[in-house]
């Protein structure tokens, strides 16, 4: 599996605090069959701003430590950007990193409210050639209440990324139910760990993928864990399936 959403850099957000914790998380990810991962620290007002260049430098340092300890996990740079106007300017200025410097941007929505500018921000990103990848849509209250909201964003050209552990209830039963609904309706394009550590939000990848396979079959899971993520890492256009219109 290629993990496209991961908090593993030490001391930058609510992920690991030390390099030792980062290495332990990396080892756990490898044991759960993840061979490559895009590092996506939070890009919001809650944590100190760190430019794309700084994140790349920190990724390089962690990659060297992984190689030193023979942990076979390949890292790429990215951010998880909280939605707001002005993200295009942040990308242009080098403040915000897309996923492995590609056309794809990991975009986080507000959990409890629906930002009125959501569709406009996505439209602005697309106008600049950016494809938004909506992070963990199963956890947003508005989408939990009405999955058609996500379907509208997908029809607008956005992609959606599910957290594997949501499928086994690690984000709560409401998120688990929503995750299954979104999968069945064809609204999920890739799956990721969104791991933050071994204690706080551990990976839960293998069990989540087993549940996804039971719902959709291994072929669909392969699309969401290898083919789609590989297209993102390699900055390639991928022919994503259209959502099931049975709403």
Model regions and ranges:
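Metallo-beta-lactamase
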Residues: 7-16, 148-154, 162-165
């Amino acid at each position: 599996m290629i993990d496209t959403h991961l908090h593993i850099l030490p001391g930058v957000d609510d992920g690991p605090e030390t390099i030792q914790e980062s290495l332990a998380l990396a080892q756990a990810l490898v044991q759960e069959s993840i061979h490559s991962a895009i590092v996506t620290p939070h890009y919001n007002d809650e944590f100190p701003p760190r430019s794309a260049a700084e994140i790349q430098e920190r990724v390089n340092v962690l990659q060297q430590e992984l190689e030193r300890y023979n942990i076979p996990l390949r890292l790429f740079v990215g951010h998880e950007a909280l939605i707001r106007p002005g993200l295009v300017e942040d990308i242009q200025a080098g403040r915000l990193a897309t996923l492995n410097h590609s056309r794809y941007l990991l975009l986080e929505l507000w959990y409890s409210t629906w930002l009125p500018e959501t569709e406009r921000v996505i439209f602005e990103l697309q106008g600049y050639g950016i494809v938004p990848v909506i992070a963990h849509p199963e956890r947003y209250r508005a989408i939990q209440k009405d999955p058609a909201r996500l379907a509208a964003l997908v029809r607008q050209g956005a992609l959606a990324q599910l957290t594997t552990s949501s499928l086994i209830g690690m984000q709560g039963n409401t998120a688990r139910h929503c995750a299954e609904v979104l999968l069945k309706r064809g609204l999920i394009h890739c799956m990721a760990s969104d791991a933050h550590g071994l204690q706080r939000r551990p990976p839960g990848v293998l069990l989540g993928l087993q549940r996804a396979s039971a719902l959709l079959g291994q072929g669909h899971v392969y699309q969401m864990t290898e083919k789609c993520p590989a297209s993102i890492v390699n900055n390639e256009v991928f022919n994503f399936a259209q959502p099931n219109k049975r709403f």
